[in-house]
């Protein structure tokens, strides 16, 4: 009790398990599930959606909503293949609008997303749904396994034939110079 599959060193002390308890928004990680709904409903990777400015006015919003691509640019007619690879927000919002929110909400439940937690608005296209990392990994495993859902399970320990128990808790610290070098490379990659 109090151990974690993924987390910080504080995990054991405060017993907050990020795998089971954290529920960050999926963001662009949600887009493959949206596109899956599109492909199931007659769209294909070559289908074209307009990537152009769009404005939504809604009394429930404090202001108008103008979704944008992360680049701040618009790309005109865009194939779904390119839109998914480039994570184009406008295409995703328009696609959700064309498909209908109810249809997409129904479809993504096949991946284990909980109906009562799925947003009922166009922000869903941008991943406003919150999910635990375990739920997210399970959903993606369905895609990776060709549509087969496999229930994740926890391996507590592995005992070798000589009765030796593998210790997964042993960590190795790399040479500090190598660590600093890699951190520099990682920072440069962030800015690409």
Q: Which residues does each predicted region cover?
A:
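Secondary-structure capping and boundary motifs in well-ordered enzyme cores
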Residues: 22-27, 72-76, 80, 84, ...
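Active-site-proximal helix/loop microenvironment
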Residues: 111-166
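Glycine- and acidic
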Residues: 13-21, 89-90, 119-124
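Active-site SXXK
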Residues: 24-51, 83, 139-143
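Short, charged, amphipathic alpha-helices and their helix-cap/turn boundaries
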Residues: 99-116
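Active-site beta-strand/loop architecture of penicillin-binding DD-peptidases
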Residues: 8-9, 13-24, 36-37, 143-144, ...
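Conserved catalytic neighborhood of penicillin-recognizing serine enzymes
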Residues: 43-104, 149, 161-189
């Amino acid at each position: 009790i109090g151990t974690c599959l993924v987390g910080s060193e504080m995990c054991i002390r405060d017993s907050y398990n990020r795998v089971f308890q954290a529920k960050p928004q999926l963001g662009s990680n949600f887009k493959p599930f949206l596109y899956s709904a599109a492909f199931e409903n007659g769209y294909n990777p070559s289908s074209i959606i307009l990537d152009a400015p769009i404005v939504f006015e809604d009394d429930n919003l404090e202001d108008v909503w103008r979704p944008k691509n992360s680049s701040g640019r618009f790309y005109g007619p865009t194939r779904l293949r390119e839109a998914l690879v480039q994570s184009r927000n406008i295409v995703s919002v328009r696609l959700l609008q064309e498909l209908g929110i109810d249809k997409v909400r129904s479809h993504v439940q096949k991946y284990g997303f909980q109906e009562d937690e799925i947003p009922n608005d166009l922000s869903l296209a941008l991943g406003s749904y919150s999910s635990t990392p375990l739920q997210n990994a399970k959903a993606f495993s369905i895609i990776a396994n060709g549509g087969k859902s496999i229930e994740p399970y926890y391996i507590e320990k592995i005992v070798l034939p000589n009765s030796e128990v593998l210790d997964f808790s042993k960590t190795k610290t790399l040479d500090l110079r190598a660590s600093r070098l890699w951190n520099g490379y990682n920072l440069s990659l962030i800015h690409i």
